């Protein structure tokens, strides 16, 4: 699966901004069929950042969210700034 097909859009809200600042986490809508390995590979390819942990959930509307925790040596704020959301 192509990295651009896996990662759809970043989720921007007060909650996600708090996660970026306090927990070094990013939140994206992802392709529903994407596995955690697909998501991790896409983050590495698109943002050159290593993933420490991924949690996923499917919303009642059928969209899949990925909560991505980056390793300590990477800053989620810098990745968010490169996307223009922070």
UniProtKB/Swiss-Prot annotation:
Source domain of life: Archaea
Alphabetized UniProt keyword annotations: Ribonucleoprotein, Ribosomal protein, RNA-binding, rRNA-binding
Pfam families, per database record: Ribosomal_L23
UniProt xrefs under InterPro entries: Nucleotide-bd_a/b_plait_sf, Ribosomal_uL23, Ribosomal_uL23-like, Ribosomal_uL23/eL15/eS24_sf, Ribosomal_uL23_CS
Biological process, per Gene Ontology: translation
Entry similarity comment: Belongs to the universal ribosomal protein uL23 family.
Function: Binds to 23S rRNA. One of the proteins that surrounds the polypeptide exit tunnel on the outside of the ribosome.
Binding partners and assembly: Part of the 50S ribosomal subunit. Contacts protein L29.
Protein name: Large ribosomal subunit protein uL23
Protein's organism: Methanococcus maripaludis (strain C6 / ATCC BAA-1332)
């Amino acid at each position: 699966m192509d990295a651009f097909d896996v990662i759809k859009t970043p989720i921007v809200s007060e909650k996600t901004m708090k996660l970026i600042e306090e927990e070094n986490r990013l939140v994206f809508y992802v392709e529903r069929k994407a596995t955690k390995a697909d998501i991790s590979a896409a983050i590495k390819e698109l943002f050159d950042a290593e993933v420490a942990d991924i949690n996923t959930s499917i919303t009642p509307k059928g969209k899949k969210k990925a909560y991505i925790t980056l390793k300590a040596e990477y800053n989620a704020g810098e990745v968010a700034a490169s996307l223009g959301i922070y």
